Design a protein with these regions (language model features):
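Extracellular/periplasmic envelope-modification machinery, especially enzymes
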Residues: 2, 6-322
Length: 322
């Protein structure tokens, strides 16, 4: 304002120029600024100083068609369809599911909506998600063939966002979160899971539910750079004791075990041991992000889980039909 805007407003030579000449001088400057803004976005990885500049590592996008990917011999999967349905955590698996499709010859059908989970194991899904859930199930019922596989992905852990981790005791917060899974909520979660699984089992498809993944008090993308080190939003840190996560997911794991015993079509896939050490789970491991934010996988995290997920699909497809 003081060094550019005000001097330009009072510059006598400019005031004496015809408006057309001023416009002719301004247009190249506007074009230059626009080109600079475009280049900043288009070449973010080259010009950014942030450790998050590598979109391939951080973003959970569909695997690029131009990027080479070694095929895998999995004839039992070739031609089958993989239906992926759920909330934003279903979308966060896109790197992994697109890679497994290219490697094995599967066809992926994706339906996701943020905040609308399938079988979240915590409570009933929100009322405004029922239309999406019914639409997704109807699509699967209409298009799936016996032997196809359905991945139901969701946030199945109580969220750790929004707490003041500097002032509040972590164990008290964890106890508060566990208390939110009241008997009524637990029963509603079970009822919804049974309704969904019963409908899918009648189709002759196989169902995969991902067990509750790690989650964190701060988001890796926001809190990995040195200049955010003192941001209050990053105070919770990018690691969690594994014992705390096991405690937070214990009720959901117990329900999953009961559902798996009740529905032979259900397979529980648990990525947590692949993402955590014996004592600690970290959002960033050896400089590589496993998670993008508090609870969504990164592109690198997807690639870490790919071999396990692919083998799970092969094992399912190799079993005798139900």
């Amino acid at each position: 304002y003081h060094f550019i805007e005000r001097p330009l407003r009072s510059a006598a030579p400019l005031l004496r120029l015809a408006p057309a000449k001023v416009l002719a001088m301004a247009l190249p400057l506007v074009a230059l600024c626009g080109a600079g803004a475009w280049a900043t976005v288009e070449y973010h990885a080259q010009v950014s100083l942030s450790v998050t500049r590598d979109g391939y590592a951080w973003q959970a996008r569909r695997y690029p068609a131009w990027r080479p990917l070694e095929p895998v011999s999995a004839p039992v999967l070739e031609g089958r369809r993989l239906f992926v349905a759920g909330d934003s955590h279903a979308a966060a698996y896109r790197t992994m599911t697109s890679m497994v499709a290219r490697q094995t010859g599967m066809e992926v059908r994706q339906q996701d909506r943020g905040g609308c989970s399938f079988v979240n194991l915590l409570r009933a899904s929100p009322a405004d998600c029922q239309g999406f859930i019914e639409d997704a199930l109807s699509t699967i019922e209409r298009e799936a063939r016996p032997g196809d596989i359905v991945l139901l992905a969701a946030l199945r852990m109580p969220e750790l966002r929004g707490f003041d981790w500097q002032r509040q005791d972590a164990q008290e917060i964890h106890q508060q979160l566990l208390a939110e899974r009241t008997p009524a909520n637990a029963q509603a979660a079970r009822d919804e899971a049974e309704r969904v699984l019963a409908r899918l089992q009648r189709l002759g498809v196989r169902v995969v539910i991902d067990a509750p993944l790690p989650l964190f008090k701060a988001g890796a993308y926001r809190c990995s750079d040195w200049f955010n080190r003192h941001n209050p939003a990053c105070a919770g840190g990018l690691s969690m004791p594994r014992a705390d996560l096991d405690r937070l997911r214990a009720p959901q794991m117990a329900l999953l075990a009961e559902l798996a015993a009740q529905y032979p079509s259900l397979t529980v896939w648990d990525p947590l041991p692949l993402l955590c050490g014996p004592q600690t789970c970290s959002a960033v491991e050896e400089g590589e992000p496993l998670f993008f934010d508090n609870d969504h996988l990164s592109g690198h995290g997807n690639r870490m889980l790919l071999p396990s997920f692919r083998q799970t699909l092969i094992d399912i497809a190799s079993e005798k039909e139900l």
